[in-house]
Amino acid sequence: MARHTRIAGITVGQSPRTDMTCDLVQRLADNLELVEYGALDGMTLEQVESELKPEPSEEVLVSRMSDGRQATFSGDKVVPLVQAKIDQAEADGCRAIIVLCTGSFPELRHTVPLIFPQPLLHSNARALAGGRRVAVMVPDPSQIEQAREWWSMSGVEVDIVSASPYQGIDGVTRAAATLKGADDAFLCLDCMGFTLAMRDAARRASGLDVLLPRTLVASVVSELLG
C-alpha cells in the first residue's frame, strides 16, 4: 500500500532520530509517512547547556543531539521550541503530530491530533498492573523524583532505576538486573530513547515483561490513522 498520510514526529532533541524512527516505522501502518522535526535543530550542545539549563524547580529532560551526544535540559524552557515545530508541521500538511518524549507538557496550540506518550504509557501501565507496583527506568538519576511524582499522580506505585538510552545497552542491562526478583508487575522504559534491543535486554536481565513507549505510541497512531 502506498504511503500517503504524513504524520510528524517531534523530538525534544535534534532530528533526524534514526535511532528512534527505525523502531517506530516498523510499527506504523503502511499508509503512514513519518516526517521528523527537532526542537533543538540548529543549536549546538554548548548553546543547549547554556540557554536551556534546568533550574532546580524545573523538569529535566534528556535527549540526543544529531551527532549522538546526550543533551540534558529544562523541559520548561524547551516548550516554546516544541510549539514552533508543531506550527511548522501543521503548515507542512501533517495529519497528526507525535511529541517524541515521555515528559510532561502543558497545553499546546494545535489543530490536528497531538499525541503525547506520557498519558498513553501511564494509563496503559495502570490498567495492566491491576494495583501492583510497576518498575520504571528513566534516563538520569536527576529524573527519579519527578518521575515518582508523575506516576503517583497517575495512581501507580513505582520502583525506579536509571540508565541512559544514549550511553549504550550495557547500562540498561545493569540497571534492569537490579530488578531481578523484585515484586513488580512489569517494567516501563520511561523514555522514547529506549530501543527494541534495549527492551529485549531489559527483559532478559530483569525477568520482567517490558512496556516500551515508542512501539506503544506507534501502535496507537496506526490504529487511529492507519
Whereabouts are the PLM-identified features?
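N-terminal glycine-rich anion-binding loop in soluble enzyme alpha/beta folds
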Residues: 2-73, 138-168
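Short hydrophobic/aromatic-enriched beta-strand-loop microsegments
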Residues: 31-35, 114-119, 156-163, 206-215
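Short gly/pro/ser/thr-enriched loop/turn and capping motifs at secondary-structure boundaries
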Residues: 42, 121-124, 143-144, 217-221
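Structural motif
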Residues: 46, 80, 165-177
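N-terminal glycine-rich phosphate/adenylate-binding segment common to multiple enzyme folds
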Residues: 72-118, 185-199
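Hydrophobic alpha-helical
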Residues: 96-99, 171-172, 183-206, 213, ...
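Anion-binding alpha/beta catalytic cores of soluble intermediary-metabolism enzymes, centered on
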Residues: 107-132, 136-141
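Short, flexible loop segments at boundaries between secondary-structure elements
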Residues: 130-131, 167-168, 210-226
